[in-house]
Amino acid sequence: MNTSVTSIKLVLLGEAAVGKSSIVLRFVSNDFAENKEPTIGAAFLTQRVTINEHTVKFEIWDTAGQERFASLAPMYYRNAQAALVVYDVTKPQSFIKARHWVKELHEQASKDIIIALVGNKIDMLQEGGERKVAREEGEKLAEEKGLLFFETSAKTGENVNDVFLGIGEKIPLKTAEEQNSASNERESNNQRVDLNAANDGTSANSACSC
């Protein structure tokens, strides 16, 4: 039995109040808070799932949607292997913002990043809310930009797990394992350098001069 764990760094992006934090809460705790406080800066959560008999650990960065925090986003999506770009199906402005995030990710994030476009709050359509972003619009954008596409309800849990499982299935686990191995090797090398420096200050100074 394979007991290795593959870590996947995932970031959530989107306008304020589209339900990013609620999606994460539903995925991690299977819970929903009706009046959740806005995220300040970013929140970090983890969740483990089994995909094709392999354990995957999602390291989730839930970023704030307020405009004043937008400049911090690159710090969180840098080196991310996956991103959720979330919009509210009842708010067309949030879909426009989602387009912006997709464009920014393609320009500045890793070229191999897996992006899922997520239309949230479909439960509101059963509660008398009016859909302002057609499903076809989301599907078209996803097809044009090579994205995964889902419509979800963080409130009811509909399709939320499917989003994360879909992303996990798209990321080659071998590649993720190689990245983890390379990271561990770099850390090991750094430790060896520190050890040598401690034993021989002259060598360390010589290296710095180069």
From Swiss-Prot:
Q: Name one GO cellular component term.
A: mitochondrial outer membrane
Describe the effect of residue 21 to L/N: Locks VPS21 in its GDP-bound form by abolishing binding to GTP
- Which residues does the record give as GTP binding sites? 14-21, 62-66, 120-123
The record describes its membrane topology as: Lipid-anchor
The answer on whether this UniProt entry bears the keyword Ribonucleoprotein reads no
Q: Where is the lipid attached (S-geranylgeranyl cysteine)?
A: 208, 210
Query: What are the boundaries of the region Disordered?
Result: 176-210
Q: Which residues get modified to Cysteine methyl ester?
A: 210
Q: How is its activity regulated?
A: Alternates between an inactive form bound to GDP and an active form bound to GTP. Activated by the guanine nucleotide-exchange factor (GEF) VPS9 and inactivated by GTPase-activating proteins (GAPs) GYP1 and GYP3.
Phosphoserine carried by residues: 188
Keyword Cell wall biogenesis/degradation attached: no
What are the GO MF terms of this UniProt record? GTP binding; GTPase activity
User: Mind listing the UniProt keywords for this protein, alphabetically?
Assistant: Endosome, GTP-binding, Lipoprotein, Membrane, Methylation, Mitochondrion, Nucleotide-binding, Phosphoprotein, Prenylation, Protein transport, Transport
Q: Which InterPro entries match?
A: P-loop_NTPase, Small_GTP-bd, Small_GTPase
Q: Where is this motif: Effector region?
A: 36-44
Q: What is its main location?
A: membrane
Q: Which SMART domains match?
A: RAB, RAN, RAS, RHO
Q: Where does the UniProt annotation locate this protein?
A: Endosome membrane; Mitochondrion membrane
- What residue spans carry the Polar residues bias annotation? 199-210
User: What SUPFAM superfamilies does its record include?
Assistant: P-loop containing nucleoside triphosphate hydrolases (SSF52540)
| The protein's role, per its UniProt record | Required for protein transport to the vacuole. Involved in two vesicle trafficking steps to the prevacuolar compartment (PVC), regulating the docking of endosomes and Golgi vesicles to the PVC by interacting with PEP7/VAC1 on the PVC membrane and promoting SNARE complex formation. May be involved in recruiting the MON1-CCZ1 complex to membranes enriched in phosphatidylinositol 3-phosphate (PtdIns[3]P) or other charged lipids, leading to recruitment of YPT7.
Q: How does it assemble?
A: Interacts in its active GTP-bound form with PEP7/VAC1.
PANTHER family on file? PTHR47978
State the similarity comment: Belongs to the small GTPase superfamily. Rab family.
Other comment: Present with 8759 molecules/cell in log phase SD medium.
Name recorded for this polypeptide: Vacuolar protein sorting-associated protein 21
Gene name as annotated: VPS21
